[in-house]
Amino acid sequence: MKQTKKIIAALAAATMVASCAGVVASADEAVNAVNVSYSTVAETFTAADGTVVPAGATAVTLSIENNTGFSASDITLNATADLLAVDGMVAATNGSAYGDAIVSAAQNGSKVVITSASLDDSKADGTLVTFYTTSAAEVTVEDASFESVKNNE
């Protein structure tokens, strides 16, 4: 009988530790996490807004993970390089995570602000936007907020 109680106590303790570990692991997963990645443009191309992006330029891509759904977003970045722009508006290519959203990006000094708006919630993980620079760039996310119109009704 004592042996059975010890086994039950050991199983209960192991279950409790496993449950706590699960809570810690899930707490580490940030929702609406914005990540930055870099790649080199292989061939010169013309962006949708008419900006010529030369071969060898750096493509800076923002992507989202654990997307909870949003119809509007504001992302503020710090950038150590000037981004390719037309009339002060950063030349950017929308990714699949923005869906049919209207996206605008502008740079003022080291600050880059990207704003989006859509009638529908986007719940897709993946690329938000890609923009370009001809010099070495380091871009960090200062702040990112995502709002859903459906949540505010």
Predicted regions located by residue number:
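Bacterial Sec-dependent N-terminal signal peptides
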Residues: 1-10
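Acidic, low-complexity intrinsically disordered segments
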Residues: 6, 28-153
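Hydrophobic alpha-helical targeting segments used for export or membrane insertion
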Residues: 9-13, 17
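C-terminal segment of classical bacterial N-terminal signal peptides
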Residues: 17-26
